[in-house]
From Swiss-Prot:
Residues 54-159, 160-268, 269-383, 384-486, 487-608 form the Cadherin domain. It comes from Homo sapiens (Human). Glycans are attached at residues 255, 437, 455, 536. PANTHER family: CADHERIN-23, CADHERIN-9. The keyword Manganese does not apply. One of its GO terms (molecular function) is cadherin binding. Residues 637-789 are cytoplasmic. This is Cadherin-9. The gene is CDH9. Three calcium ions are usually bound at the interface of each cadherin domain and rigidify the connections, imparting a strong curvature to the full-length ectodomain. InterPro entries: Cadherin, Cadherin-like_dom, Cadherin-like_sf, Cadherin_CS, Cadherin_Y-type_LIR, Catenin-bd_sf. Keywords: Calcium, Cell adhesion, Cell membrane, Cleavage on pair of basic residues, Glycoprotein, Membrane, Metal-binding, Phosphoprotein, Repeat, Signal, Transmembrane, Transmembrane helix. Residues 1-21 form the signal peptide. Cadherins are calcium-dependent cell adhesion proteins. They preferentially interact with themselves in a homophilic manner in connecting cells; cadherins may thus contribute to the sorting of heterogeneous cell types.
């Protein structure tokens, strides 16, 4: 609390409580009950009677925030029963008794033991009583009184927030409310101006002002622009005592932001933009970006781009990038340098959310000129059509021209073009094409029935730049000609009952034709000219591409004729007329009365061959026995043990011993065909190799095709040069094994062979075991020791 404000407060208290305050400070007070008459005693002992304002004795007043060194005097309690002899004792109870307030039990003087704060508690209720020390009885009934704490201006105003945040739209008029700030003062508002707060602005002029009583902050300047300044800091002061000098004050800070309104149109930073584009770019390609600047923010800065006019409005398009607010120039139609090299566009940028309040400022859009230069590139040939359809009769001769494709070079240089057929689409090489003019011709005969359609691809390539090529599909439809005769649609197993009657239908036949005439099939049936009048059966044309076979006589006999062959002439109505003869086999069968077949001519056929059932069984048994004998003979021959040629591994008599065994090398099993040296179409087949040595694997080189009339010597020299120039070949000093001839000999060298100096050291008896051919040699070296002596 601030102590320098006590003197004015004392003066104010003196004005309202003149007499009471003087008497309280000069003489002791006596506390009387409501039945007594309160009074004051002076030094001369005379009683001053008071009949008015007796209630003042029921309350005391005390200033807060006392800073003196002694205890603060509150007042004095006194009763008429007190004779001054010390027999009475004053007792104080209630709020703060004994701690905040103490009483002299002999004199009744009350003092404040501590400094008091009205803001903490402004009113204390206490009770006082006087008792006789000797008897302990109350000489006066207990009575209640009040101590009120008088306020002093010891609290400055405080705002509800230390920092306020507010916003106001830019371009607002003067007096637009922004925010209201509020400050409170803890002092007593009922006494004086200690709690009367007045607001003023310390920082923020001349942009803002504050209402001194309500604390409402308002705009003070018109048309403040966010683009010029967006943030403002305003300091507001609240001062008590009605703003008079000596009042306490507090401050707060208000951060005010100007919010954006759409008061600025978009503007291009430059009036002309230049872009380049190759003529071969695909549709939808982004050529470049343009951007108009808008100082507004948020949705107020959103804009949309459009092509207003220009000679390329149908060739290009502009797309708005919502994230970057840029206009993207894209290709809408295919470009052609030869047709037009430069396009000029006018592109508009306009706000999508204009504010009607600011439309008077002008149109919220801007226009820029975009120039697009088309760059010439070497383009591939272009066919005059996207695809070709060729129709050709299937009987066209080989080498005949059936159609033509045409391509041109769109470049200004107009390079020459050659045509070819993609053989991946014509594996059988049925068609060819003249490379100069694109005429397509046949290389083989055509057959609609095997392949009615052929889909090939023709390539057009620039002669000067083979990398530039185009492809076009060519659909070749083979048209049908009447080159197939009609024939039976299926194999018919026809029978006739022995008890059949004349005119009975025994079979209906239909035919098929591999041809496909445009007007549909129409077939006719007739007997063959050699048998125009058949005594057994009649052919009836049903006029619906079918024919019925009718019996012509009464009854048939299996014994006389078990099978009839009926030739039928079938022909169509297309040009040229094709015909064929189909023979229908009709068996004679035994049937019941309803015409159901019971048995047919199988037995009759067997009997007609002159073989009975027993004979057939005998033949089958003989064949079976013969097969068994052959199998047994083969099994015995495989089980026969061969006689060993050499009984002992050391016996080499009468045997051929091969010493030049070259096994272990490449496991080639086929000899080299020298005939391929003179075959220009020869190719080396890649074989799997399992080389033993060397272990280094080199890249396989393809054989260069040989032309005719090159002899073997030239070929070998040519291959030798290729091998010498091959970078993948091993160096000259590397070890190359061409023929692996087995392991080394047991003998290290010829020096290991030595002659025996004594015949006694050699035993030649084994020569006699070598057979008759070595008998003479055995006799010469295998004699007894006595003979040798």
């Amino acid at each position: 609390m601030r102590t320098y404000h006590y003197i004015p407060l004392f003066i104010w208290t003196y004005m309202f409580h003149t007499v009471d305050t003087i008497l309280l400070q000069e003489k002791p007070n006596s506390y009387l009950s409501s039945k007594k008459i309160a009074g004051l005693t002076k030094d001369d002992g005379k009683m001053l009677r008071r009949t008015k304002r007796g209630w003042m004795w029921n309350q005391f007043f005390l200033l807060e925030e006392y800073t003196g060194t002694d205890t603060q005097y509150v007042g004095k309690l006194h009763t008429d029963q007190d004779k001054g002899d010390g027999n009475l004792k004053y007792i104080l109870t209630g709020d703060g008794a004994g701690s905040l307030f103490v009483i002299d039990e002999n004199t009744g003087d009350i003092h404040a033991a501590k400094k008091l704060d009205r803001e903490e508690k402004s009113l204390y209720i206490l009770r006082a009583k006087a008792i006789d020390r000797k008897t302990g009885r109350q000489v006066e009934p207990e009575s209640e009184f009040i101590i009120k704490i008088h306020d002093i201006n010891d609290n400055e105003p405080k705002f509800t927030k230390d920092l306020y945040t507010a916003s106001v739209p830019e371009m607002s008029g003067v007096g637009t409310s922004v925010i209201q700030v509020t400050a409170t003062d803890a002092d007593d508002a009922n006494y004086g101006n200690s709690a009367k707060v007045v607001y003023s602005i310390l920082q923020g002029q001349p942009y803002f002002s504050v209402d001194p009583e309500s604390g409402i902050i308002k705009t003070a300047l018109p048309d403040m622009s966010r683009e010029n300044r967006e943030q403002y800091q305003v300091v507001i002061q609240a001062k008590d005592m009605g703003g008079q000098m000596g009042g306490l004050s507090g401050t707060t800070t208000v951060n005010i932001t100007l919010t954006d309104v759409n008061n600025n149109p978009p503007r291009f930073p430059q009036s002309t933009y230049q872009f380049n584009s190759p003529e071969s770019v695909p549709l939808g390609t982004h050529l470049g970006r343009i951007k108009a600047n808008d100082p507004d923010v948020g949705e107020n800065a959103e804009m949309e781009y459009s092509i207003a006019e220009g000679d390329g409005a149908d060739m290009f398009d502009v797309i708005t990038d919502k994230d970057t607010q840029e206009g993207i120039i894209t290709v809408k139609q295919n470009l052609d340098f030869e047709n037009q090299m430069l396009y000029t566009l006018r592109v508009d940028a306009s706000n999508t959310h204009p504010d009607p309040r600011f439309l008077h400022l002008g149109p919220f859009k801007d226009t820029a000129v975009v120039k697009i230069s088309v760059e010439d590139i070497d383009e591939p040939p272009v066919f005059t059509k996207v695809s070709y359809l060729i129709e050709v009769d299937e009987d066209v001769k080989e080498g005949s021209i059936i159609g033509q494709v045409t391509a041109y070079d769109p470049d200004a240089r107009n390079n020459l073009i050659k045509y070819s057929v993609d053989r991946h689409t014509d594996m059988d090489r049925i068609f060819g094409i003249h490379s100069e003019n694109g005429s397509i011709f046949t290389l083989k005969a055509l057959d609609r029935e095997s392949s009615p359609w052929h889909n090939i691809t023709v390539t057009a390539t620039e002669i000067n730049n083979p990398k530039q090529s185009s492809h076009i599909p060519v659909f070749i439809r083979i048209l049908d000609i009447n080159d197939h005769a009609p024939e039976f649609a299926m194999y018919y197993e026809t029978f006739v009952c022995e008890n059949a009657k004349p005119g009975q239908l025994i079979q209906t036949v239909s035919v098929m034709d591999k041809d496909d005439p445009p007007r549909g099939h129409k077939f006719f049936f007739e007997p063959v000219p050699e048998f125009t009048l058949n005594p057994n059966f009649t052919i009836v044309d049903n006029k619906d591409n079918t024919a019925g076979i009718m019996t012509r006589k009464d009854g048939y006999s299996r014994n006389k004729m078990s099978t009839y062959l009926l030739p039928i002439l079938i022909f169509d109505n297309d040009y040229p007329i094709q015909s064929s003869t189909g023979t229908l086999t009709i068996r004679v069968c035994a049937c019941d009365n309803q015409g159901n077949m019971q048995s047919c001519t199988a037995e009759a056929l067997i009997l007609s061959a002159g073989l009975s059932t027993g004979a057939l069984v005998a033949i089958l048994l003989c064949v079976l026995i013969l097969l068994i004998l052959v199998v047994l003979f083969a099994a015995l021959k495989r089980q026969r043990k061969k006689e060993p040629l050499i009984i002992s591994k050391d016996d080499v008599r009468d045997n051929i011993v091969t010493y030049n065994d070259e096994g272990g090398g490449e496991e080639d099993t086929q000899a080299f065909d020298i005939g391929t040296l003179r075959n220009p179409e020869a190719r080396e087949d890649s074989k799997l190799r399992r080389d033993v040595m060397p272990e280094t694997i080199f890249q396989i080189r393809r054989t260069v095709p040989l032309w005719e009339n090159i002899d073997v010597q030239d070929f070998i020299h040519r291959r030798l040069k290729e091998n010498d120039a091959d970078p993948s070949a091993p160096p000259y000093d590397s070890l190359a094994t061409y023929a692996y001839e087995g392991n080394d000999s047991i003998a290290d060298s010829l020096s290991s062979l030595e002659s025996l100096t004594a015949d006694c050291n050699q035993d030649y008896d084994y020569l006699s075991d070598w057979g008759p051919r070595f008998k003479k040699l055995a006799d010469m070296y295998g004699g007894d020791d006595s003979d040798r002596d």
